[in-house]
């Protein structure tokens, strides 16, 4: 009899919460650093790999920004994105929705067009090669000002045909969604979808703000929404999808043990939880690893596995005919 892990590897999957800068494997980071003559703090690939064994958020962020520092040219963004797409294609991921953080690159003097052209070309090539579809989400860094977000939006305007949605990420505590209310209104007026990281470290109130003030189409993380019964009902009433990241939660100590992960509880409550990898190179795994961690840790059932995969398809921003196609494939596999 086929195991759940084998089934999870075969099933068509979507990834809705993925930071492209978080897919930087140590070998590739080192190679691009050498290509661009950027000096890293680490003299060998092995030394760099050792740094990936961080135990706190600050060490992770230090390493994350080191990685960003080597991305200088369009080819770098293309190579980074293509390596991720090739990896997840091998894991039966059929559709991806990718965040990129332009402000983190603009502050280093790397132009907006350099970033987006490299990423978008890779997304196009993945569709030509494998039929993998995608959406691109420009994310604002919440520790920066609303003014900086508006400036970034202006730079994005010539490229809006390539951008499908707007996100909000980085250090959550002390930077509530309402800080960016006006810029999100401007984005919605341009016809862009909106999502926001909320309720990972921040309080349930941040999730309320994302829903009621920003009017998000989706919630990224959302774990702490479970602390507020009225909030759970509000999320269900709006039929919002939660993009949950199990291994990220474990690595950043949002949960202390995978057996305590709230995703089973989310499903039991009728919430549209999905499985995603967040920053897979840093958090110990891509999509198959995240599903395996839930199967082994939380003992999800076959029905729950199906529901998670289904939620990933229905909660995506892909076109309806593609949703129907992938749902048909999913049903056939679980029949």
From Swiss-Prot:
Pfam families: A_deaminase (PF00962)
Record keywords: Hydrolase, Metal-binding, Nucleotide metabolism, Zinc
SUPFAM superfamilies listed in its UniProt record: Metallo-dependent hydrolases
Family matches, as Gene3D superfamilies: Metal-dependent hydrolases
Enzyme class: hydrolase
Catalyzed reactions per annotation: adenine + H2O + H(+) = hypoxanthine + NH4(+)
Cofactor(s) this protein requires: Zn(2+)
Listed GO biological process terms: adenine catabolic process; hypoxanthine salvage; nucleotide metabolic process
InterPro entries linked: A_deaminase_dom, ADE, Ado/ade_deaminase, Metal_Hydrolase
Cofactor note: Binds 1 zinc ion per subunit.
UniProt record similarity statement: Belongs to the metallo-dependent hydrolases superfamily. Adenosine and AMP deaminases family. Adenine deaminase type 2 subfamily.
Function, as annotated: Catalyzes the hydrolytic deamination of adenine to hypoxanthine. Plays an important role in the purine salvage pathway and in nitrogen catabolism.
Protein known as: Adenine deaminase
């Amino acid at each position: 009899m086929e195991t759940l892990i084998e089934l999870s590897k075969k099933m068509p999957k979507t990834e809705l919460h993925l930071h492209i800068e978080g897919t930087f494997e140590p070998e590739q980071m080192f190679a691009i650093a050498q290509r661009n003559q950027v000096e890293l703090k680490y003299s060998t690939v092995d030394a760099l790999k050792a740094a990936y064994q961080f135990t706190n958020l600050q060490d992770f962020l230090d390493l994350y920004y080191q990685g960003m520092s080597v991305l200088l040219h369009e080819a770098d963004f293309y190579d980074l994105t293509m390596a991720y797409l090739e990896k997840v294609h091998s894991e039966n991921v059929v559709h991806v929705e990718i965040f990129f953080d332009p402000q983190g690159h603009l502050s280093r003097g790397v132009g907006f067009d350099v970033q987006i052209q490299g990423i978008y070309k890779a997304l196009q090539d993945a569709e030509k090669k494998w039929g993998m579809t995608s959406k691109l989400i420009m994310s604002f860094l919440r520790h920066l000002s609303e003014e900086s977000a508006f400036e970034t939006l202006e730079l994005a305007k010539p490229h809006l045909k390539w951008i499908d949605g707007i996100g909000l990420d980085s250090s959550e505590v002390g930077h509530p969604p309402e800080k960016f209310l006006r810029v999100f209104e401007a984005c919605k007026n341009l016809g862009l979808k909106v999502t926001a990281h909320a309720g990972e470290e921040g309080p349930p109130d941040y999730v309320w703000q994302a829903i009621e003030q920003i009017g998000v189409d989706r919630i990224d993380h959302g774990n702490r929404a479970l602390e507020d019964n009225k909030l759970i009902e509000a999320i269900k009433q709006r039929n919002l999808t939660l993009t949950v990241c199990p291994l990220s939660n474990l690595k950043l100590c949002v949960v202390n043990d995978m057996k305590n992960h709230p995703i089973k509880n989310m499903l039991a409550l009728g919430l549209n939880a999905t499985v995603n990898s967040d920053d897979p190179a840093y958090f110990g795994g891509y999509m198959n690893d995240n599903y395996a961690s839930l199967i082994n840790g939380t003992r999800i059932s076959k029905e729950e596995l199906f529901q998670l995969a289904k939620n990933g398809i229905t909660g995506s921003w892909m076109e309806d005919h593609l949703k129907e196609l992938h749902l048909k494939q999913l049903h056939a596999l679980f029949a």
